[in-house]
Amino acid sequence: MSSKTRPVLLAKGKKLHLPNHIAIIVDGNGRWAEQHGLPRFEGHLAGIESVRSTIRCLNQYQIKYVTLYGFSTENWNRPKYEVMNLFRLLEEIVDKESQELHKLGVKIRHLGRLEELPQGLQQAINRAIELTKNNTGMTLSLAFNYGGRTEILDAVRAIIAEGVPPQSINEKLFNNYLYTAGLPDVDLIIRTGGELRISNFLIWQASYSEYYFTDVLWPDFGEKEIEKALLSYSQRQRRFGGL
C-alpha cells in the first residue's frame, strides 16, 4: 500500500494496534432522513454511500475482517413497504458493489437466515459469495436477517440433529455450528446513531469485544469517525479476564 493511498491516520506516522475483526451496527438512516426532511428510504440510500466508503477505508487500513449488521431478525416488525424497499435496494447494491469489491480482493459472506429473504436478494448474495469465494483480502460479512439468539438456537438444533455426544461439545465445536464459523471473534464493535446497546448482535462472538459508541448517524459516518474509533481501540488494554 503506497503512502499516497494510506488513510490520514497512518500518513501521520502514528503506530496503532489495529483490530483484526471490526463489526459495525449500522444505525441512524431513518433519523438522518427525518432530520433532513426526507423520506426514510433516502436515509437508506445515503447509508449505502457510507457502507461503500467505510469498506474502502477499512480496506486501506488492512483490516482483515469486517462485519456489517444491516438487517436484524427483529427488523421484520417495521412497516412492510419500508422493508421491501430496503430489500430491493440491497439486491441492487450487492450486485453492483460485489463487482467492485471483487477487484479489491474482498471475500463476501452472509450471516443469518438467508432462506427467509426475498428470492432476488438471496440470489444476489449467492452470486456475490460465488464471485468472491477465492479472494484472500478482507472478508466482508453481511449480516442480513441476523439475530444473535437465533444464531445460537440454530447452532444447538444442528448439533442435536447430527447426534453429537454431549461430552464432545465444547466452545471450539460450538463455534463450528455458528453462522460465523471460520471467522475470528470480534475485536471491536462500532455502533453509530447514539444508542448504547448491542441489539442482539454477535452475542457469542463479542464476549471480549471492545465497544465504540458514537452519536454520529450512519450516513454521516466517515473517515474521521473511523479514525476516532481506531485511536480509541488502540489506546485500550485488553485483558481477556486476566490482570
PLM segments and residue spans:
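Flexible, compositionally biased loop and terminal segments
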Residues: 1-243
